[in-house]
């Protein structure tokens, strides 16, 4: 009788579950995403565990950024309370201006639809605002300004004509800055930027939705015979999403680096949390095949993604719809 019951008991789901976790084989158990999914390897499981740990620390990182903003705000108030009445000018005089030139190249105007032009406009607004409040503001250039971008700014942001501490030019950057001073920031460059030379002018491609024009900024840099480089993102960060940085991502990372002289701190202060960024030294080791499966290199162009919590009020487009916070 017992021999007849034995096959039925072996086929029981409960017994199968116990067998799968017995004899020290817990580590060999292969979790599945769903009933029809492929089994997950131990290495992939380890990566998922690392990511889970990173996600669990999300609030802690968010609080740290909030505390940093509060501390800076308190420092400004203390400066103002100790001033002689000319508070704002007093604070601005304490800023250590950088001689580094940061250029947004707007020569891709005819390659973008109006929706992307509006995104670029918002990113430029963010760059301007961040540079105005930075401890080490850069010499900000907006070149090849015209076409759809200028028209959109005229219609939706007429105050841009009164912007201060910015050079808005219709000329191409190659007509304004010496060739030997230029460095184009592009993900396709084989050169990795290790430090910033404040005598140089770093160019950011003002191109939204660059996936339709892959390698365009690199081709432009080589055609003009100027230096090119990419930020050392891969040395400090591993991301589980597309490695695409918006214009103001790049701009703000450079501002942060000028203040901290720490690339990793700059990346993790600026990069949006939803990109799943993890410090490179904390990410588990992966095989060359894993690297090949990662998304292709980041670029200074964007798809209108937003970064850290934006303290500024959201902008509205022509239809009166609230847009995402600006970044890049």
Swiss-Prot record:
<dbReference type="InterPro" id="IPR028564">
    <property type="entry name" value="MT_TRM10-typ"/>
</dbReference>
<feature type="compositionally biased region" description="Basic and acidic residues">
    <location>
        <begin position="52"/>
        <end position="62"/>
    </location>
</feature>
<dbReference type="GO" id="GO:0000049">
    <property type="term" value="F:tRNA binding"/>
</dbReference>
<dbReference type="GO" id="GO:0005730">
    <property type="term" value="C:nucleolus"/>
</dbReference>
<comment type="subunit">
    <text>Interacts with tRNA.</text>
</comment>
<comment type="function">
    <text>S-adenosyl-L-methionine-dependent guanine N(1)-methyltransferase that catalyzes the formation of N(1)-methylguanine at position 9 (m1G9) in tRNAs. Probably not able to catalyze formation of N(1)-methyladenine at position 9 (m1A9) in tRNAs.</text>
</comment>
<protein>
    <recommendedName>
        <fullName>tRNA methyltransferase 10 homolog A</fullName>
        <ecNumber>2.1.1.221</ecNumber>
    </recommendedName>
</protein>
<feature type="compositionally biased region" description="Basic residues">
    <location>
        <begin position="63"/>
        <end position="75"/>
    </location>
</feature>
<keyword id="KW-0539">Nucleus</keyword>
<feature type="modified residue" description="Phosphoserine">
    <location>
        <position position="22"/>
    </location>
</feature>
<dbReference type="InterPro" id="IPR016653">
    <property type="entry name" value="TRM10/TRM10A"/>
</dbReference>
<feature type="coiled-coil region">
    <location>
        <begin position="43"/>
        <end position="83"/>
    </location>
</feature>
<feature type="domain" description="SAM-dependent MTase TRM10-type">
    <location>
        <begin position="88"/>
        <end position="278"/>
    </location>
</feature>
<dbReference type="InterPro" id="IPR016009">
    <property type="entry name" value="tRNA_MeTrfase_TRMD/TRM10"/>
</dbReference>
<feature type="region of interest" description="Disordered">
    <location>
        <begin position="1"/>
        <end position="91"/>
    </location>
</feature>
<keyword id="KW-0489">Methyltransferase</keyword>
<dbReference type="Pfam" id="PF01746">
    <property type="entry name" value="tRNA_m1G_MT"/>
</dbReference>
<dbReference type="InterPro" id="IPR007356">
    <property type="entry name" value="tRNA_m1G_MeTrfase_euk"/>
</dbReference>
<keyword id="KW-0597">Phosphoprotein</keyword>
<feature type="compositionally biased region" description="Basic and acidic residues">
    <location>
        <begin position="305"/>
        <end position="319"/>
    </location>
</feature>
<keyword id="KW-0949">S-adenosyl-L-methionine</keyword>
<dbReference type="GO" id="GO:0010960">
    <property type="term" value="P:magnesium ion homeostasis"/>
</dbReference>
<comment type="similarity">
    <text>Belongs to the class IV-like SAM-binding methyltransferase superfamily. TRM10 family.</text>
</comment>
<feature type="region of interest" description="Disordered">
    <location>
        <begin position="281"/>
        <end position="328"/>
    </location>
</feature>
<dbReference type="GO" id="GO:0052905">
    <property type="term" value="F:tRNA (guanosine(9)-N1)-methyltransferase activity"/>
</dbReference>
<dbReference type="InterPro" id="IPR038459">
    <property type="entry name" value="MT_TRM10-typ_sf"/>
</dbReference>
<keyword id="KW-0808">Transferase</keyword>
<dbReference type="GO" id="GO:0030488">
    <property type="term" value="P:tRNA methylation"/>
</dbReference>
<dbReference type="GO" id="GO:0005634">
    <property type="term" value="C:nucleus"/>
</dbReference>
<keyword id="KW-0175">Coiled coil</keyword>
């Amino acid at each position: 009788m017992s021999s007849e019951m034995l096959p039925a008991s072996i086929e029981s789901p409960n017994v199968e579950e116990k067998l799968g976790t017995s004899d020290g084989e817990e580590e060999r158990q292969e979790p599945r995403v769903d009933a029809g999914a492929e089994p997950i390897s131990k290495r992939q499981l380890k990566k998922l565990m690392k990511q889970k740990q990173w996600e669990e620390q999300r609030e802690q990182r968010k609080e740290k950024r909030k505390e940093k903003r509060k501390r800076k705000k308190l420092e400004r108030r203390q400066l103002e309370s100790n001033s002689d009445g000319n508070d704002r000018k007093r604070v601005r005089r304490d800023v250590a201006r950088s001689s580094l030139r940061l250029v947004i190249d707007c020569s891709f105007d005819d390659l973008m639809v109006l929706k992307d032009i509006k995104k670029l406009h918002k990113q430029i607004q963010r760059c301007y605002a961040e540079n105005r409040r930075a401890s080490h503001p850069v010499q900000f250039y907006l070149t090849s300004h015209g076409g759809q971008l200028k028209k959109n700014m005229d219609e939706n942001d007429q105050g841009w004509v009164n912007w201060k501490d910015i050079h808005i030019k219709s000329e191409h950057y190659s007509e304004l800055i010496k060739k030997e001073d230029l460095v184009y920031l592009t993900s396709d460059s084989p050169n990795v930027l290790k430090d910033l030379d404040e005598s140089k002018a770093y160019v950011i491609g003002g191109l939204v939705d660059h996936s339709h024009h892959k390698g365009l900024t690199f081709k432009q840099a080589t055609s003009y015979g100027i230096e090119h480089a990419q930020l050392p993102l891969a040395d400090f960060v591993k991301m589980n999403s597309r490695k695409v940085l918006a214009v103001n991502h790049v701009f703000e990372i450079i501002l942060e680096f000028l203040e901290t002289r720490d690339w990793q701190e700059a990346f993790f202060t600026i990069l949006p949390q939803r990109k799943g960024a993890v410090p490179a030294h904390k990410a588990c080791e992966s095989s060359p095949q894993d690297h090949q499966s990662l998304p292709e290199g980041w670029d200074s162009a964007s798809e209108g993604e937003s970064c850290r919590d934006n303290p500024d009020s959201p902008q509205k487009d022509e239809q009166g719809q609230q847009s995402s916070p600006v970044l890049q």
